[in-house]
């Protein structure tokens, strides 16, 4: 049986998700809700095989070991710590990651 991880979402990531909803909802509230539900489903899949997701390209520059899950135009930045998957941020794919985004 595959190992199951506990997925934890930081306050910063929760705020990112709320911001994404607000941005999409300006034009299409129903689409915003549907997108967020699907995004949360995708995040939930990290309970199993989070290693399937690639490392973020910024790791070399930042000296970190973060991975990302891509969905739509967004990437969910996370790290694996023992049996936990910690969701650090949910960012637009064009946005580069820096250490200030990961503090907190």
Residue ranges and their predicted role:
Residues 1-64:
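Basic, Lys/Arg-enriched alpha-helical interface segments
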Residues 26-29, 65, 88-90, 97:
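Short, low-complexity, polar/charged sequence segments that are solvent-exposed and flexible
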Residues 71-104:
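Enriched for short, Lys/Arg-rich terminal
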């Amino acid at each position: 049986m595959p190992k199951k991880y506990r997925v934890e979402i930081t306050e910063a990531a929760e705020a990112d998700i709320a911001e994404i909803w607000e941005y999409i909802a300006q034009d299409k509230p129903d689409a915003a809700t549907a997108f967020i539900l699907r995004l949360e489903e995708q995040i939930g899949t990290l309970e199993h095989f989070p290693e399937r997701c690639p490392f973020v390209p910024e790791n070399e520059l930042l000296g970190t070991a973060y991975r990302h899950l891509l969905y739509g135009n967004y990437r969910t930045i996370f790290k694996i710590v023992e049996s936990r998957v910690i969701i650090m941020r949910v960012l637009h794919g064009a946005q580069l990651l820096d250490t200030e985004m990961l503090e907190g």
